[in-house]
């Protein structure tokens, strides 16, 4: 791997360039009209204009990025986060032209990008799930019966959802019909998919995510947790590592569950498995983010590791740099 294109901008592009320089790999930046003078453009070894200022006319233009990969003999693409980082179609197109995506396969993205598919995949690996259903529901009466069985309060959630969109809390049966219709409408307009499912609402939950890495040989490790319970409108505000509520035993159990999630979708690269935890410290699988996250430096601080370097090493076919026993938490 001699030449890597970063299909992103700003802070994450600069972060990837820093590690590429350290590893003596050539970096290729892309930029829009608005970013012509941006730091990542000057810090990369090469930089190419891909379009006008709106991201839809530049950073999301798969055709231009793929053409650039072919013309500039790019070996691999680092997608960063956002933009095309969890786009299975883009992953497939890169594969077709012989360019390695520094990330998971399209099939892993496809499974984990749909909450229902993800639940069905991890169920076979005995990963704890919030009580509810793991199939799409459209019939109101059937949905009401399920809600009654698992007891209110319940959540109606969009299968393709994220960031709190297409999610509705229902406290009583008389609210159900209206809230379900609102969830479906929001899911349809936000994701083009109105499939919804029902889960028991976990009251006063903690939100704990586990950083994972998997190589091409089927080996998986976890790099411990980040707690992101402090949120506003379902968006994380503070990330803390390690979590103050996890005992070594619970941490190990959550880590094993996260590893099972990776195995359920034949994962490769960096990912984050998110769990909800109730007041009794029971934890439940929520979803998996199939990319490096904005908050990855929090994990780097407590492990002393360069997670972008791990991503690149795995993408070029190396084994995991460390075993689970060699990984330790250092600091807070």
What is each residue range found by the language model?
Residues 1-273, 277-296, 302, 319:
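N-terminal beta-alpha lobe that positions the nucleotide/phosphoryl donor
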Residues 141-143, 278, 312-332:
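Peripheral (often C-terminal) accessory segments that flank ATP-dependent C-N-forming ligase machineries
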Residues 301-304, 329:
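Active-site-proximal structural scaffolding
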Residues 305-312:
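Polar, glycine-rich mid-to-C-terminal structural blocks
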């Amino acid at each position: 791997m001699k030449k890597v294109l970063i299909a992103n901008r700003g802070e994450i592009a600069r972060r990837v360039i820093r590690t590429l320089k350290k590893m003596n790999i050539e970096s290729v930046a892309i930029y829009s009209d608005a970013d012509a003078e941006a730091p990542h453009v000057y810090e990369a070894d090469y930089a190419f204009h891909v379009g006008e200022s709106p991201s839809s006319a530049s950073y999301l233009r798969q055709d231009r990025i793929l053409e650039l990969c072919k013309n500039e003999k790019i070996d691999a693409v680092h997608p960063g986060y956002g933009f095309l980082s969890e786009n299975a179609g883009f992953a497939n197109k890169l594969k077709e032209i012989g360019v390695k995506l520094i990330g998971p396969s399209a099939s892993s993205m496809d499974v984990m990008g749909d909450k229902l598919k993800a639940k069905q995949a991890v169920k076979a690996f005995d990963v704890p799930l919030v009580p509810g259903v793991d199939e799409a529901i459209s019939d109101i009466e059937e949905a009401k019966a399920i809600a009654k069985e698992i007891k209110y309060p319940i959540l109606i959630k969009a299968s393709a959802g994220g960031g709190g969109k297409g999610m509705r809390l229902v406290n009583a049966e008389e609210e159900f019909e209206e809230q379900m219709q609102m969830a479906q409408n929001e899911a349809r307009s936000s994701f083009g998919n109105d499939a919804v499912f029902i889960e028991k609402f976990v009251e006063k939950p903690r939100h704990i995510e586990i950083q994972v890495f998997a190589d091409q040989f089927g080996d998986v490790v976890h790099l411990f947790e980040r707690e992101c319970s402090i949120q506003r409108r379902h968006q994380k505000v503070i990330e803390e590592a390690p979590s103050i509520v996890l005992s070594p035993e619970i941490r190990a159990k959550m880590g094993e569950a996260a590893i099972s999630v990776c195995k359920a979708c034949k994962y490769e690269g960096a990912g984050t498995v998110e769990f909800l935890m109730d007041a009794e410290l029971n934890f439940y699988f929520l979803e998996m983010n199939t990319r490096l996250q904005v908050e990855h430096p929090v994990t780097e601080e407590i492990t002393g590791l360069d997670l972008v370097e791990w991503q690149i090493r795995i993408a070029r076919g190396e084994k995991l740099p460390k075993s689970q026993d060699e990984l330790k938490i250092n600091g807070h």
